[in-house]
């Protein structure tokens, strides 16, 4: 078995030295793992959006539309070229990946061998462990290669792997091969195996050949053991009960030793009896018969002793073999435990990779849908480009007469613009002149207002003075009236003296007339002053309000 394990390890190293690294498949097929694919798709989306924006961009007039078309035409052509380049790159990448997948289609594996039932499960597990120990260093692929279940079986039980007669072996049916062939291009997890599938298939074939050779050697080695070992090797437990077998052998060895000891004791007793009876020299028949009987017993015991010694040596050999097998079974138990742990971890990783494979499959389906959508979009864009080229040629034919008319209109508008510019300059000069005049008028108005304010102040002072004079005259008039009333009373008092004093009255009358004349003169002067003050006040008020002044009254004129 050690030789087989060593040879298996050497073959694994030889096969792994020729293996290629399949991890680049993941970076080329998944959108999340491929930076190149993600960048190209983003750039394609941006280019399509820019192209649609340039195509749908609107203008106010046909001339402006034509000008915009001439300006955006090179950019549109560049965008279409870039879009076509990225599409071709994606198509080539997809074609390369699908081609590699078709090349890596699985081959039919048929394992044929005889006498596989003679191999114990521990030997098979150890052999498989030696072949797979280096391979578990990287994550397992999402899809098991054909023949993987053949080596593992249902939970590692050899009863599921082989028939009892040991002549039949597991094979792959046609339906399984068809499903494998169809899953090459439809199942994304298979991409993780990639280009090293052929080397893996070759490796599996080598392992099958080595298993057959190891099986033959083990069968030849196990043929020399006792028949009691064969049912234990073939049992579903896959392990020989070596401790129980060792205990049975030890017990059998003890019994044989006890029998040997008893035989030796009997031989010693018989020899002592023979030595005691031989010197007597009895020549009678009874003594001779007893001696012959003792000799027969000695020979029988010697034969039994020889047989027992042979059996003891055989038992000791078997005991040594059993001890070696027990030690080997202990190491096989440790290997089996490690193999079971590795198998559980491998199954967990296989489940994880299966989930990842389903996610990758969904991503690939989305990518294929997106590629088909981009193909249809590209066809639509090609039709739009052809329509735009047709519209451009029609527009170029129709735009020449309109262009001449537009040039004439532009020349006429330029002349009108020059004329309007001259008029605008004249208007600006007039506006500046009017602004200067307005400033002058405002300055004169301010000066006039200041002058009028000063005159109003003077007139106000005069009015105050005249008011005082009027008050003084009013007091004088009141005094005169009081004097008149006093004189009237005196006249009444002196009525009696009228006659007597006619001269005196006449004189007084003349004086009174003179006083009255003076009074009238004073009143007339006061009225004249009042009228003059009133007229001056009205004239000032009218001057303030902006009306032309009126002439003085007739009283002032008189």
From Swiss-Prot:
Which keywords has UniProt assigned to this entry?
Answer: Coiled coil, Membrane, Vacuole
Origin, by domain of life?
Eukaryota
Pfam families per record: KIP1
User: InterPro entries recorded for this chain?
Assistant: NAB (IPR011684), NET_actin-binding_domain (IPR051861)
Q: Which SUPFAM superfamilies match?
A: Tropomyosin
| Tissue distribution | Expressed in the epidermis of the root meristem and the early expansion zone.
Name one molecular function that GO assigns to this entry.
Answer: actin binding
An example Gene Ontology CC term for this record: vacuolar membrane
> Where is the stretch described as Disordered?
162-183
Q: Which residues form a coiled coil?
A: 194-363, 421-527
* Cellular localization per UniProt: Vacuole membrane
Family assignment from sequence similarity: Belongs to the NET family.
What is written about domains in the entry's comments? The NAB domain, also called NAB (NET actin-binding) domain, is sufficient for F-actin binding.
Q: What is this protein called?
A: Protein NETWORKED 4A
Organism this protein belongs to? Arabidopsis thaliana (Mouse-ear cress)
Q: Which gene encodes it?
A: NET4A
């Amino acid at each position: 078995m050690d030789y087989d394990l060593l040879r298996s390890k050497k073959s694994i190293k030889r096969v792994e030295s020729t293996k290629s690294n399949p991890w680049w498949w993941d970076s080329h097929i998944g959108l999340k793992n491929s930076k190149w694919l993600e960048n190209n798709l983003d750039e394609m989306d941006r280019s399509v959006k820019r192209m649609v924006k340039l195509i749908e961009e609107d203008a106010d007039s046909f001339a402006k539309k034509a000008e915009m078309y001439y300006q955006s035409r090179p950019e549109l052509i560049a965008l279409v070229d870039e879009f076509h380049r990225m599409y071709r790159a994606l198509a080539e990448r997809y074609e390369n990946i699908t081609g590699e997948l078709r090349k890596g289609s699985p081959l039919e594996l048929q394992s044929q061998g005889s006498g596989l039932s003679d191999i114990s499960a521990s030997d098979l597990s150890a052999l498989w462990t030696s072949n797979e120990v280096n391979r578990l260093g990287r994550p397992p692929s999402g899809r098991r290669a054909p023949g993987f279940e053949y080596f593992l079986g249902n939970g590692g039980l050899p009863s599921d792997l082989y028939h009892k007669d040991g002549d039949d072996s597991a094979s792959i049916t046609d339906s399984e091969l068809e499903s494998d062939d169809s899953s090459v291009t439809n199942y994304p997890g298979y991409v993780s195996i990639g280009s090293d599938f052929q080397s893996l298939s070759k490796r599996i074939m080598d392992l099958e050949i080595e298993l057959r050779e190891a099986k033959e050697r083990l069968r030849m080695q196990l043929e020399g053991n006792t028949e009691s070992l064969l049912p234990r090797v073939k049992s579903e437990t896959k392990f020989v009960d070596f401790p129980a077998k060792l205990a049975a052998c030890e017990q059998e060895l003890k019994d044989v030793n006890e029998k040997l000891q008893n035989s030796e004791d009997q031989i010693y007793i018989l020899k002592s009896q023979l030595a005691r009876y031989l010197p007597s020299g009895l020549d009678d028949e009874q003594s001779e018969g007893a001696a012959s009987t003792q000799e027969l017993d000695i020979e029988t015991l010697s034969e039994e002793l020889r047989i027992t010694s042979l059996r003891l040596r055989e038992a000791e050999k078997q005991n040594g073999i059993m001890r070696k097998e027990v030690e080997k079974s202990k190491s096989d138990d440790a290997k089996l435990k490690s193999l079971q742990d590795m198998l559980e971890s491998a199954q967990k990783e296989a489940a994880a990779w299966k989930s990842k494979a389903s996610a990758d499959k969904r991503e690939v389906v989305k990518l294929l849908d997106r590629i088909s959508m981009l193909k249809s979009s590209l066809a639509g864009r090609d039709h739009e480009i052809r329509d735009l080229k047709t519209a451009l040629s029609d527009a170029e034919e129709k735009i020449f007469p309109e262009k001449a008319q537009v040039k004439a209109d532009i020349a006429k508008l330029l002349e009108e613009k020059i004329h309007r510019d001259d008029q605008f300059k004249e208007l600006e000069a007039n506006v500046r002149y009017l602004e200067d005049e307005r400033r002058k008028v405002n300055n004169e108005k301010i000066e006039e207002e200041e002058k009028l304010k000063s005159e109003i102040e003077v007139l106000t002072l005069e009015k105050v003075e005249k008011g005082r004079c009027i008050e003084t005259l009013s007091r004088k008039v009141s005094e005169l009236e009081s004097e008149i009333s006093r004189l009237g009373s005196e006249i009444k008092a002196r009525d009696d003296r009228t006659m007597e004093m006619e001269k005196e009255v006449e004189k007084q009358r003349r004086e009174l007339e003179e006083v009255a004349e003076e009074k009238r003169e004073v009143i007339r002067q006061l009225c004249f002053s009042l009228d003059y003050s009133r007229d001056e006040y009205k004239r000032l008020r009218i001057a303030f309000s902006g009306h032309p002044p009126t002439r003085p009254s007739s009283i002032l004129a008189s």
